[in-house]
Amino acid sequence: PLLRLIHDPPQRLYVRGDPEVLREPQLAVVGSRKASAAAVRAAETLCGQAVASGLHICSGLALGIDAAAHRGALRAGGKSVAVMATGIDEIYPARHRSLAAELARSGCLVTEFAPGTPPLRHHFPRRNRIISGLSLGVLVVEAALPSGSLITAGTAVEQGREVFALPWSMLHPGGAGCLRLIRDGAKMVLDIEDVLEELGPMYRLQQDLFEAQQGPGDAVAAAASPILDLLGFEAASPDELVRATGLPAAQVMAELSALELEGRVTRCSGGYTRT
């Protein structure tokens, strides 16, 4: 449900594994392909703790942090989603074929690219919007400057998702990107509780989105909403609604998504208007 609400959702998805996993709460975990040993351990530990708390892990099947995130989830008995920049039959990198097979058994592989599509450079940034779009938030474990992980973080912000980053030392070779994200407003993560605390509102609202798609129910958007009360025929931006309601940004974005799904609000260039 969350992916459908981004401004440029994929027209179709090819899935290998269990597609129902895509409907369930996920945390995106990304970072450097040339990850440090400390970052690999951090990714595996945090992802294991996340799945123990009921989240699935979403990442990109790349070397480094992506692989550590997937493995951390699997070792903890959880499920993980790998979003690919190739066709569903083209595993990249090739050394991750066994990892991909394991992911497909408990979670799934997913891509918007047709079977047979090779790993083209310009497909990776497009893939990143799906990683963030499927997820409640994005955790950047390690990132230098520049880094593709920062593209994913930027896309997450545009989609109204929470962004998290680990606070490395300024002397850590792969930590500059994370420090910049924290400077720019990302939530600093010292343990998994920092993530879970922020994702609570988004987690609950995703369940309401799912229930709304199943048919009539008690979705949050159907109840009296302070956001709906504030919207008229002039567009209001999410930032304006955050200030006016005093609600967390994640909750505002989640409620707007639920209201949009129900047809009660319309997204436009200036923000949102009441339908």
Language-model regions: role of each:
Residues 1-275:
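Glycine-biased, small-residue-rich flexible motifs in mid-sequence functional cores and linkers
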